[in-house]
UniProtKB/Swiss-Prot annotation:
Expressed in hemocytes (at protein level). The keyword Secreted applies. One of its GO terms (cellular component) is extracellular region. It comes from Tityus serrulatus (Brazilian scorpion). The modification Lysine amide is found at K36. Antimicrobial protein with activity against Gram-positive and Gram-negative bacteria, filamentous fungus, and yeast. Was tested against Micrococcus luteus A270 (MIC=0.5-1 uM), Echerichia coli SBS 363 (MIC=9-16 uM), Pseudomonas aeruginosa (MIC=0.01-0.3 uM), Aspergillus niger (MIC=3-6 uM), and Candida albicans MDM8 (MIC=1.5-3 uM). Has no hemolytic activity against human erythrocytes. It is found in: Secreted. This is Serrulin. Belongs to the glycine-rich peptide family. One of its GO terms (biological process) is defense response to fungus. Residues 16-37 are annotated as: Disordered. Keywords: Amidation, Antibiotic, Antimicrobial, Fungicide, Immunity, Innate immunity, Secreted. The keyword Secreted applies.
Amino acid sequence: GFGGGRGGFGGGRGGFGGGGIGGGGFGGGYGGGKIKG
């Protein structure tokens, strides 16, 4: 739900800063997090 989406956004930010969580960078982290959330 909404909370899950927020978690996904946070993960995406981490991906951008850290160099790519799940090898997806900001776009992959944000999109993947939202889908999973």
